[in-house]
């Protein structure tokens, strides 16, 4: 396949709505043919890693990311395993034992995150605590997905941080993607950069940051609905008369103008 084709496929996959990768894959195969399968699967693999998609590994959700990728496999230091991935079906394969050193602070973060997710995130929620090569640094990832295709919407929350214990610094991003597609096609994305200093308890700080982010989102939704959208609506006179829709719409001035292209 040409480089241009590869780029187009990657861009389409990159913009795929949360929870709809298999549908996008089938559509691309229909359009581009079976010969494009390898290119599409490679793009899906990049998508899964970039979005820290949870993979089903023997019935457990395990996040994959750039932080726990080792060669062609991924490691889960918390559960002590390493595995390959079927990226299309998001399944773990060839599971093997894996040992990693997890210090006391990281163990505390694992416990605290488990409690935080169980009381604050709906749907399918999981997290990862990943020791990095620099011993003072730990990657913390939270992913919550809620897919409801029967009601035409899917949602994906990802927050990703790196905590430097020596510097007391927490940096990362919070990302939300929602797709609503009943009688329309609306895709919502919100992202926030995080950079905090003098942090001693990373999970406590994450709770505060994410609670504030959620509050700000709610306020922006309220403002959008009650102010911005209302200003877009055209004010029409109230006639208190029932409009006869259908062919009779041509009897009204608005209908005649529309029919005549005015």
From Swiss-Prot:
GO terms for biological process: actin cytoskeleton organization; barbed-end actin filament capping. GO terms for cellular component: actin cortical patch; cellular bud tip; F-actin capping protein complex; incipient cellular bud site; mitotic actomyosin contractile ring. The keyword RNA-binding does not apply. GO terms for molecular function: actin filament binding. PROSITE patterns: F_ACTIN_CAPPING_A_1, F_ACTIN_CAPPING_A_2. Coiled coil: none annotated. InterPro entries: CapZ_alpha, CapZ_alpha/beta, CapZ_alpha/beta_2, CapZ_alpha_1, F-actin_cap_asu_CS. Keywords: Actin capping, Actin-binding. F-actin-capping proteins bind in a Ca(2+)-independent manner to the fast growing ends of actin filaments (barbed end) thereby blocking the exchange of subunits at these ends. Unlike other capping proteins (such as gelsolin and severin), these proteins do not sever actin filaments. Belongs to the F-actin-capping protein alpha subunit family. Heterodimer of an alpha and a beta subunit. This is F-actin-capping protein subunit alpha. It comes from Candida glabrata (strain ATCC 2001 / BCRC 20586 / JCM 3761 / NBRC 0622 / NRRL Y-65 / CBS 138) (Yeast).
């Amino acid at each position: 396949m040409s480089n241009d084709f590869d780029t187009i496929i990657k861009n389409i996959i990159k913009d795929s709505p949360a929870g709809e990768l298999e549908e996008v894959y089938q559509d691309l195969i229909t359009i581009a043919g079976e010969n494009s399968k390898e290119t599409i699967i490679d793009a899906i693999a990049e998508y899964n890693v970039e979005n820290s998609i949870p993979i089903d590994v023997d019935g457990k959700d395990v996040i994959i990311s750039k932080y726990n990728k080792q060669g062609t496999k991924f490691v889960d230091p918390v559960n002590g395993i390493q595995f390959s991935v079927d990226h299309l079906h998001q399944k773990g394969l060839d599971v093997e034992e894996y040992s990693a050193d997890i210090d006391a602070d990281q163990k505390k973060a694992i416990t605290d995150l488990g409690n935080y997710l169980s009381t604050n995130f709906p749907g399918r929620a999981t997290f990862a605590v990943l020791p990095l090569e620099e011993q003072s640094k730990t990657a913390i990832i939270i992913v919550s997905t809620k897919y409801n295709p029967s009601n035409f919407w899917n949602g994906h929350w990802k927050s990703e941080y790196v905590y430097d214990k020596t510097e007391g610094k927490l940096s990362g991003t919070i990302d939300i993607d929602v797709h609503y597609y009943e009688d329309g096609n609306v895709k919502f994305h919100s992202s926030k950069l995080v950079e905090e200093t003098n942090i001693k308890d990373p999970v406590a700080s994450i709770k505060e940051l994410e609670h504030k982010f959620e509050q700000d989102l709610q306020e922006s939704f309220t403002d959008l609905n009650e102010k911005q959208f209302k200003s877009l609506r055209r004010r029409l006179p109230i006639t208190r008369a029932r409009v006869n829709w259908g062919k009779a719409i041509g009897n009204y001035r608005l209908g005649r103008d529309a029919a005549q292209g005015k």
